[in-house]
């Protein structure tokens, strides 16, 4: 888990193509052990993303089924997660200047809360039609 230790202190902003193989390897190595369901054979890439986010909260984003679908990253495989990282990097870069006072909430966590409110719970309607 040397690779994960190197990602833990990092922020999403410098995410680059050099990071892609590491993220794919971590994603795939976490997915199999986090299987669930009745027979323990159902892969949960939601659980994978949650675990990775807990271990590198400013670098590896959270997702769930509605969020992944909303960002066009379904069926939620490792390469989709990398594409999602790129999307979150771009959004984090746009959002960061709007957050003048640093606090204990990472930009990725703020983006997750936004996406959860809009796409998972549908508490917020964007009206972008």
Task: Locate predicted features.
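Catalytic Zn2+-binding segment of zinc metalloproteases
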Residues: 54-61
């Amino acid at each position: 888990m040397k690779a994960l230790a190197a990602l833990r202190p990092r922020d999403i902003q410098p995410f680059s193509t050099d990071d892609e193989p590491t993220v794919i390897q971590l994603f795939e190595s976490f997915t199999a052990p986090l299987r669930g369901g009745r027979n323990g054979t159902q892969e949960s890439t939601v659980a994978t993303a949650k675990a990775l986010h807990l271990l590198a909260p400013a670098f590896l984003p959270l997702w769930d089924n509605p969020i992944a679908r909303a960002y066009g990253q379904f069926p939620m495989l490792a390469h989709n997660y990398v594409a999602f990282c790129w999307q979150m990097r771009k959004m984090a870069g746009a959002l960061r200047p709007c957050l003048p006072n640093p606090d204990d909430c990472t930009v990725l966590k703020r983006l997750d809360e936004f996406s959860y409110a809009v796409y998972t719970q549908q508490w917020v309607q964007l009206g972008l039609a």
